[in-house]
Design a protein with these regions (language model features):
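Transmembrane beta-barrel wall of Gram-negative outer-membrane proteins
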Residues: 24-25, 237-270, 274-313, 343-364, ...
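Signature of Gram-negative outer-membrane beta-barrel scaffolds
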Residues: 468, 494-666, 838, 845
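Outer-membrane beta-barrel signature, preferentially recognizing the C-terminal barrel domain
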Residues: 330-352, 356, 639, 643-650, ...
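Surface-exposed extracellular loop regions of Gram-negative outer-membrane beta-barrel proteins
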Residues: 315-320, 541-555, 598, 609-639, ...
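Gram-negative outer-membrane beta-barrel transporters
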Residues: 727-730, 751-889, 1003
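Short acidic/polar hinge/loop motifs at secondary-structure boundaries
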Residues: 135-136, 142-145, 173-204, 220-223, ...
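C-terminal beta-signal and adjacent terminal beta-strands/loops
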Residues: 731-733, 879-898, 902, 910, ...
Length: 1006
């Protein structure tokens, strides 16, 4: 009996002890990677040793809680519609509930929500003024989802930044152009299905594939396994870009044997309803295969390209648009044999090959090794002429404003845009009649006269073409090698990093595309011939050929290179690292990189103007006739200016540091901040004064420094979505180079500026609010900023033919223009007020703004999404867009006649008589009128036996507003008055947005 009692007591004590064994759990919030927005309805599965021990579902705010877990290691899998599965290891210790803070999920192409980005399948390329996305990604963020696509037609720049500040990756390799820094949209345009799956970071946020900059980054996965499984076909037509797009894509998805493969092809053909001469004849293809091995290794091979051609649009002056009665006028085309022919056609074929090796032995570690090669050609045709009149129909001498009555030719023309018929001379009136007539008899005057160009060449006695069509080439060979790692150290911290190497060798040259009826084109410098006609050696574009072939200029036939030929060589190496800590509702990230960049020019032609060093020129002179002797050209430092061979190599150290701090609160509130400092090397295009002709690099070339910060508040709960951001960015020590014909020098010149500073500050606000009607929501976005120039850069102007420096000084009215106080004197005349020292009193300044983007952009709309129907109606407002400035107009030289001998501004209200009126006429920056637009879209999809049929229709600019300027520039030329007392501007040139336009897409998924 005692034994029985003892046994029962032991059992009861053991049971009590067992009941008291500590149990814990796991909690956190499931959020999207872009914007940290909550993901409701996500499914969580907790497993131990392959057996499911618990399940849960995230709430409306993304929160989840799994309890009653014994101490130990668990595997947690999270799945959600539209996102990639997430698998992590979780350790429960001492009965505590483990807080995972944020479980971030990456969007997946496998399941698509019905939203605007699916319906509006934008084609992204470098066409300049078409409807390309302004932010390369869209997301659930209430601001980015609108700004990413909805503002693209107006050329909106996110926070006023140029596109080169946004990092674009393909399969983990940064693809921004090595020469210019710009995002290479044209490499994958037309491959929408393949590039749909992407990962994004916004603003200063870092990523898993690089430390990034201050304008966000996008990584297009591109792997075959990321392409949506099944077959998709689509047919699209639109009225603003091209007539027809056909697209076919197939993805196998991951197969049982570990293989995945995908293929895609598309064609875009035809013109549009608005801009004559603009057309597409472009194609695209993608081939990809991927093998997943059983030990965590994956190997993928991808190849894609977008061969094709498209006709381009040209900007024109408002005078031309008004004469034609059409803001969509395009001066690039004319009729040839009854067919439209565009003189400016871009032809491209730049295939990209990617080999990627991924090693992920566990859920906590991943490494990726990627090799990417970009090659091919990119050509752009244009007219060239020699010893002949300018063939462009909108050339200023062909316009009525060139011939006023009772004035000397060239007098006051640019100041008189609003002339009447009676103001014109007889010649000007004939021009006016020719431009305004709608008779077919004047088509050859209003557009390119191809027949005249051919006839001029036919009548050439020796077969030499006076007119030809050139093709300017930028042919890249771009090699990239990348190694990235990601290591989850524990449940709340992740370390990532990598090494990137790039070598780019790009050939710049031009060749003859069409001799236009002639037999050859002479390879000489027409500008040099005007100045140095007595020395034939000096005008040669290829002096070595001239000497080797009996002192005869090279005759170029179709396909031959001429004019210039050089290589731009760029090397970039970068080491980056990032650390992310998520604990107790805090999220902390720090990242940074250090890098090295170098570049040099390598000339392939010896130009007679810059034949070489003193020793090289001495050797050449021994071969040249006595009447054609040359001299070495020396720069201001006594160094020889050369054209052939390697230039000096410039070396730069680069780097950045970034920090991110976030605090989440109950109820879906989050506050976060970013801070970043960047030191970037200038690009090749910003460094060389005239790479077409010589090896000279601009002086005082230094790194560009950027300081950026933002503060954010976000609320996301129960369908409500709000984000508010305040940002500030300072960019210092930028450089810029341009070349243009300077009438004051009667020569083609180069203009280099250094020390350009900018300041960008503003706010972003976005919201999405559900309305009482199921599926209906109110959405709004506001971007309000001030993007200004804050320095007066230093400029050096040189003659292109001689490298002679003709001007060097600051550009005193680049960043702002002083506004002076005035008073009325005893005679009732207005005068400038002076202080006690005799200086004019400044009452304020008129700022100059970063151009070609609205500083204020807003949208308010209704969105209805239910039962696979999608409808959206939105109104947009854009304001404070400004014209791109010509720095020459902001120099003291261009403002001559405005100041007295003491340097004080002369008060004058007549713009044609110098003084203050003329000063403000020369220095003011044009601001475009505010714009109001109305857009709508509708879409529907049906599921039939797991197959999908759908359509989408988008209509933009419903009010048919044809007066919307999207950009433009001041011409880089000056006109003298007949008295030579003052200079005048040339008329500015503009681009306009098309009127009402549509895009209709029908798609099938099997």
């Amino acid at each position: 009996m005692k034994k029985l009692v003892s046994i029962l007591s032991l059992i009861l004590v053991s049971a009590a002890l067992l009941a008291q064994t500590p149990t814990g759990g796991v909690t956190g919030a499931v959020v999207s990677r872009a914007g940290r927005l909550p993901i409701p309805g996500a499914n969580l599965i907790i497993q131990k040793d392959g057996q499911t021990v618990a399940t849960s579902t995230s709430a409306s705010d993304g929160r989840f809680l799994v309890e009653a877990l014994a101490d130990g290691m668990y595997q947690m899998t999270i799945t959600a519609d539209g996102y990639k599965d997430l698998r992590v290891n979780v350790t429960v210790d001492n009965g505590f509930v483990k807080d995972m803070i944020f479980m971030t999920m990456t969007p997946d192409v496998q399941v698509e929500s019905v939203d605007a980005s699916n319906f509006t399948e934008f084609d992204m390329d470098d066409s300049g003024y078409n409807d390309n996305p302004t932010i390369l990604f869209s997301s659930n963020d209430p601001y980015n989802s609108v700004a990413g696509y909805g503002f693209s037609s107006i050329r909106f720049k996110n926070r006023g930044y140029n596109s080169e500040t946004q990092d674009v990756y393909f399969s983990g390799v940064r693809l921004n152009d090595a020469i210019t820094g710009y995002s290479p949209y044209s490499l994958w345009t037309g491959l929408n299905e393949v590039t749909r799956s992407k990962e994004t970071s916004t603003g200063l946020e870092s990523s898993d594939y690089g430390s990034g900059g201050y304008n966000g980054s996008t990584n297009i996965f591109g792997n075959p396994s990321n392409v949506r499984k099944g077959l998709r076909a689509s047919v699209l037509t639109n009225s603003a870009m091209y007539r027809l797009r056909l697209m076919l894509t197939y993805g196998s998805g991951p197969l049982d044997n570990g293989w995945s493969y995908a293929v895609s092809a598309s064609a875009r053909v035809g013109g549009n309803d608005w801009i004559k001469g603009v057309y597409y004849r472009s194609f695209a293809y993608y081939l990809g295969a991927e093998k997943k091995f059983g030990d965590g290794k994956t190997l993928a091979l991808m190849h894609f390209a977008t061969p094709g051609q498209r006709g381009a649009q040209n900007a024109s002056t408002q005078e031309v648009y008004d004469l034609m009665g059409d803001n969509m006028y395009n001066s690039n085309w004319g009729y040839q044999n009854g067919k439209v022919r565009n003189s400016r056609v871009r032809k491209t074929f730049e295939p990209v090959t990617v080999l990627r090796y991924r090693y992920a032995p566990s859920a906590n570690f991943e490494s990726n090794t990627i090799f990417l090669w970009r090659t091919g050609f990119n050509g752009y045709t244009a007219l060239d002429w020699y010893d002949a009149s300018d063939p462009r129909p909108d050339y200023y001498r062909n316009l009525p404003s060139y011939s006023f009555a009772n004035s000397t030719e060239g007098d006051d023309q640019s100041a008189r845009y609003d002339y009447s018929y009676d103001d014109l001379s007889k010649k000007g009136q004939l021009m006016y009649e020719a431009w305004t007539s709608r008779s077919s008899d004047y088509l050859m005057y209003q557009h390119l006269n191809w027949d005249r160009l051919y006839n001029v060449n036919y009548n050439s006695a020796d077969g030499r073409s006076k007119y030809a069509q050139e093709q300017r080439h930028v042919d890249q060979n771009d090699l990239n090698l990348v190694e990235n790692i990601k290591w989850r150290i524990n449940d709340y911290s992740v370390l990532s990093g990598g090494v990137n190497f790039k070598y780019n060798r790009t050939e710049y040259y031009k060749k003859i595309a069409d001799l236009l009826g002639g037999e050859y084109f002479l390879n000489v410098d027409s500008f040099a011939e005007r100045d140095f006609a007595i020395n034939e050696a000096k005008i040669q574009n290829d002096l070595d050929y001239y000497i080797a072939n009996g002192f005869k200029s090279e005759k170029i036939t179709k396909g031959g290179k001429y004019g210039y030929d050089y290589f731009a060589n760029v090397i970039k190496a970068n080491l980056w690292a990032g650390y992310n800590l998520q604990k107790d509702n805090w999220d902390i990230k720090v990242s940074g990189n250090v890098g090295y960049e170098s570049f040099w020019r390598e000339g392939m032609m010896r130009k007679g103007l810059f034949a070489g060093t003193e020793g090289e020129v001495a050797e050449l002179n021994r071969k040249l006739p006595a009447t054609q002797q040359l001299k070495a050209v020396l720069d201001a430092d006594g160094n020889a200016v050369t054209s052939k061979g390697k230039s000096e190599t410039k070396h730069f150290l680069t780097g950045s540091a970034k920090a991110y701090l976030s605090r989440s609160f109950k109820g879906g509130h989050r506050v976060y901040a970013n801070l970043g400092v960047f030191s970037d090397a200038p690009t090749f295009n910003e460094a060389f004064i005239s790479p077409r002709t010589r090896n000279t690099i601009i002086g005082n070339l230094r790194n560009k420094f950027t300081y950026s910060a933002d503060l954010n508040y976000q609320y996301s709960n129960k369908g409500y979505n709000v984000r508010f951001t305040a940002f500030y960015t300072k960019i210092k020590n930028q450089s810029d180079v341009m070349s243009f014909y300077d009438d004051s020098q009667n020569s083609f010149t180069n203009f280099a500026m250094t020390g350009i500073d900018q300041q960008h500050l503003g706010i972003e606000f976005g919201f999405s609010v559900p309305l009482p009607v199921t599926g209906l929501s109110l959405e709004g976005v506001l971007s309000a900023g001030e993007y200004t120039y804050t320095s007066n850069p230093y400029m050096v102007q040189t003659i292109d033919n001689s490298a002679e420096v003709v001007r060097q000084s600051t550009v005193p009215y680049w960043s702002k223009v002083p506004l002076y106080a005035t008073y009325e004197d005893a005679a009732g005349m207005t005068q400038f007020d002076m202080d006690g020292d005799g200086n004019m009193i400044v009452k304020g300044y008129k700022k100059h703004y970063v151009p070609s983007t609205p500083q204020i952009a807003a949208q308010l709309g209704l969105k209805y999404n239910i039962n696979y129907w999608f409808l959206e109606l939105n109104a947009q407002c854009f304001a404070k867009s400004h014209l791109d400035m010509n720095p020459l107009y902001r120099t003291d030289f261009a403002c001559k006649g405005c100041f007295d001998e003491n340097g004080n501004l002369i008060y004058n209200e007549d713009v044609n008589k110098g003084g203050s009126a003329h000063f403000y006429y020369m220095t003011d920056q044009e601001e475009f009128k505010p714009v109001f637009l109305l857009n709508a879209s509708v879409g529907k999809s049906w599921y039939i036996n797991n197959n999908q049929l759908g359509f989408s229709l988008q209509v933009n600019n419903i009010t048919n507003n044809r007066g919307v300027k999207t950009g433009g520039y001041e011409q880089t030329r000056l006109q003298n008055s007949s008295s030579k007392d003052v200079y005048y501007r040339f008329q500015s040139k503009y681009f306009y947005m098309s009127g009402i336009n549509y895009m209709l897409n029908v798609y099938f998924r099997f």
